[in-house]
Amino acid sequence: MLVPLYEAVYQRLEVGSATRLLGLGCGSGLALLMAASRGAGVTGVDACAPERLALARERLLPEAWGTRARARTRLVDGEPADLASDAGDSGTAAYNLVTAFEPVGCVAGDSEGLGELLAGARPLVGRGVPVVIAGWGPPERCATASVLRVATKLADPLRGAGSWRPALRDDLEEVAQRAGLRPDGSGRVACPFGYADVDNAVRGLLSTGLFDAAVAATDQAQVDKELREALHPHQRRDGTVWMPNIFRYLIARTP
């Protein structure tokens, strides 16, 4: 769903064979796979979704790959601190690009978690290294925002850090400032969410983890029902589901 975002960032930063990329919250590894296809060495860390990390391993570490290609790819079920041995004393930073593509700005408190990830990655990079963070665009430019409100409504008994909130204009800049990073450019990218039918849309949205609290507060059947109703306005005559969205990215640099 965020492929245009990944492509825009990689093209702007000229990701290639000289790139040593650290992907924070790498999820299913699609962004890492795209970087690896450009020749980059990639490392991904994720402590929140073991099932998605397992998919990343299938994508990035297939047995068919040669030894050299596999050596330039690493996946870790954990936090950036688990890569502390990569810091080394050789004078060469372990990574020269850090990405955190999991977009902030739709769940209250998500930026705090991102700040912790960025802080954990700081010892692994040198000065002036680009750090890319991403966020949802304005609610009026994101059709999916109305669907995400279902998560808030159903998770009301667990109200708090998991509640939906609209993205704010300076979300990314504030995250960078708190992490001690210097903003050095930004952009907006259209990332429409398209699905073959409602069933596929429900499965795809549930896989993001944004509805986990709603499922815990009610049950799977109730969440499915509410999601289908919320998706109805976005269903086309041919049965496909189409939701235009705008995402922002910020490039910041380490001091």
Features from the language model and the residues they span:
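Conserved alpha-helix/loop element of class I SAM-dependent methyltransferases that forms part
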Residues: 1-19
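Class I SAM-dependent methyltransferase SAM/SAH-binding core
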Residues: 20-22, 28-87
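Conserved Class I S-adenosyl-L-methionine
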Residues: 28-30, 173-255
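Class I S-adenosylmethionine-dependent transferase superfamily signal
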Residues: 35, 120-121
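A conserved beta-strand element that flanks and buttresses the S-adenosyl-L-methionine
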Residues: 99
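Hydrophobic adenine-recognition pocket in adenosine-nucleotide-binding enzymes
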Residues: 103
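A short, conserved alpha-helix within the catalytic core of class I
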Residues: 106-120
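Conserved catalytic/acceptor-binding region of the Class I
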Residues: 116, 122, 126-194, 212
